[in-house]
């Protein structure tokens, strides 16, 4: 779990202003989990980055698990930002879990020719 966390921090810990791209929203959606709902293992490839905004998380809600190693148990108001190619899943939940998911793609910055 430590290696995934460290790699994700290195991957995301950059100053976007210094890079030659901007982030654009590729797509976004809401998901409303009730008792016994789950999400199978998946990634958000080809999106470059993904995020989950947790709107409602009951204490009995299932965590999100990345690459079978890193378990994140967010609370309402938490935002999780991660590489889009990182596999993750949500086990069967015992409580409500309402989220907004957003995928981002890198868009090259275009400089005007003067």
Predicted feature residues:
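Catalytic core of non-heme Fe(II) oxygenases with the double-stranded beta-helix
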Residues: 14-92, 96-99, 105-110
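Short, well-structured hydrophobic secondary-structure segments
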Residues: 1-18
């Amino acid at each position: 779990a430590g290696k995934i966390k460290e790699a994700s921090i290195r991957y995301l810990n950059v100053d976007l202003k210094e890079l030659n791209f901007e982030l654009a929203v590729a797509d976004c959606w809401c998901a409303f989990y009730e008792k016994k709902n789950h999400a199978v293992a998946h990634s958000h490839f080809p999106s470059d980055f993904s995020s989950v905004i947790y709107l409602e998380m009951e204490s009995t809600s299932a965590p999100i698990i990345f690459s079978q190693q890193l378990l994140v148990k967010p609370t309402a108001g938490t935002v999780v930002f991660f590489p889009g190619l990182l596999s993750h899943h949500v086990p069967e939940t015992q409580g409500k879990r309402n989220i907004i998911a957003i995928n981002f793609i890198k868009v090259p910055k275009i400089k005007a020719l003067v």
